[in-house]
Amino acid sequence: MADLFAPAPEPSTELGRLRVLSKSAGIRVSPLILGGMSIGDAWSEILGSMSKERAFELLDAFYEAGGNFIDTANNYQNEQSEAWIGEWMVSRKLRDQIVIATKFTTDYKKYDVGGGKSANYCGNHKRSLHVSVRDSLRKLQTDWIDILYVHWWDYMSSIEEVMDSLHILVQQARSSIWVCLIRLPGLFLRQITTLNLMVKPLLASIKVNGTC
């Protein structure tokens, strides 16, 4: 009975000292997120890459050290990143222990169907969101995405379409509520606020530098 109220053991590393994601999102995440851009070997000639065996070793080491927060995107390593992370989670039976962040907007099918035939696999519009999330769920072998990033603003899709589509997605429970906008121009953020189109219960506007 005493064990019922015993404190959790000290983590083996500081990576395991989890913290609350934000004031509006109580999920606990590791202080560092593992970036998945180099998980895969399709981009070996232009960016970092690794074999599936080495990728699994990296993911194992990250989890064993206490990490639970993994970032990827629909297009990383021509879709290998999401697929390998999904395969790893299934093989280790760890989906419920991992917080997954992925992204849509970038054309993730050009390598497969060819340039000029993949226009609706990219951008911020409703169709792009639908097919990207559908395929990310399949590759990650999961029923939900914890955090979904709008990877970049396409300056063509309307704010109304984007925000309405994201809101519907959250209501369908395909994303665990948290939707983040990366590189959102200040003008659009002001318009979203004015139009009261905030995705509920949380919309975070995040400005980042460089490629992610």
Swiss-Prot record:
Origin: domain of life: Eukaryota
Active site per the UniProt annotation: Y76 (proton donor)
Keyword Oxidoreductase: yes
InterPro entries according to UniProt: AKR_Detox_Biosynth, NADP_OxRdtase_dom, NADP_OxRdtase_dom_sf
Assigned protein family: Belongs to the aldo/keto reductase family. Aldo/keto reductase 2 subfamily.
EC number: 1.1.1.-
Pfam families xref list: Aldo_ket_red (PF00248)
UniProt keywords, alphabetically: Oxidoreductase
GO MF terms, alphabetically ordered: oxidoreductase activity
Name of the protein in question: Putative aryl-alcohol dehydrogenase AAD6
Enzyme class: oxidoreductase
Annotated organism of origin: Saccharomyces cerevisiae (strain ATCC 204508 / S288c) (Baker's yeast)
